[in-house]
UniProtKB/Swiss-Prot annotation:
Its cofactor is FMN. One of its GO terms (cellular component) is membrane. The lineage of its organism: Bacteria, Pseudomonadati, Pseudomonadota, Alphaproteobacteria, Hyphomicrobiales. InterPro entries: Flavodoxin/NO_synth, Flavoprotein-like_sf, Flavoprotein_WrbA-like, FMN_Rdtase-like_dom, NQO. This is NAD(P)H dehydrogenase (quinone).
Length: 199
């Protein structure tokens, strides 16, 4: 049975919700799935004052955890068109895994959130995907089999590079059912690919 890790950073809960949807899709495909988050770098008093969602159920991952999975799906909100520093800091510590080829051939994918439709979704996905390719991973996006990413009747995230959600400038918009369905679809596709490659 393929093992899938959904690894995320979520300051306000939007990416946490997307991570849960990715995991649902991967489980539907028959994979064993774990959801973990990366450590918070913001001091606790600052995070509380900024209304960060600190009560997240997922355990904090370690770098060595990454080697134990057949697929790793990474999600983080955008920070100025690229991944959040918390995720970047975590992945920067994976040099030892890279050096010994521990992630070569694993399946990878990315998902993100932005405040606006044009707030850097694709560049943020690419900032994650670049890491996955350097690690030697096989990248799986959100293919157009998920046709709802082309909807024009509502504000909706989604790109062929990965599932996305739009939060609104004040963060009040939660992932829509269409966006969650995209995350589930991508999670399922990644798990199916991992099962094909790794059994």
């Amino acid at each position: 049975m393929a093992k899938v890790l959904v690894l995320y950073y979520s300051a306000y809960g939007h990416i946490e919700a997307m991570a849960n949807a990715v995991a649902e899709g991967a489980r539907e495909a028959g994979a064993q799935v774990d959801i973990k988050r990366v450590p918070e770098l913001v001091p606790p008093d600052v995070a509380k004052a900024s209304h960060y969602k600190l009560d997240q159920a997922a355990p904090v991952a370690t770098i060595e955890d990454l080697a134990n999975y057949d697929a790793i799906v990474i999600g983080t909100g955008t920070r100025f068109g690229r991944m959040a520093s918390q995720m970047s800091n975590f992945l920067d510590q994976a040099g030892g895994l890279w050096a010994r080829g521990a992630l070569n051939g694993k399946v990878g994918g990315a998902f993100t959130s932005t405040a606006t439709q044009h707030g850097g979704q694709e560049t943020t996905l690419f900032s994650i995907i670049t890491n996955l390719l350097h690690f030697g991973m096989v990248v799986v996006g959100l293919n157009y089999g998920f046709g709802d990413q082309m909807r024009l009747d509502q504000v909706t995230g989604g790109a062929p590079y990965g599932a996305t959600t739009i939060t609104g400038g004040d963060g009040s918009r939660q992932p829509s059912e269409t966006e969650l369905a995209g995350a589930r679809y991508q999670g399922k596709t990644i798990a199916e690919t991992a099962i094909k490659l790794h059994g």
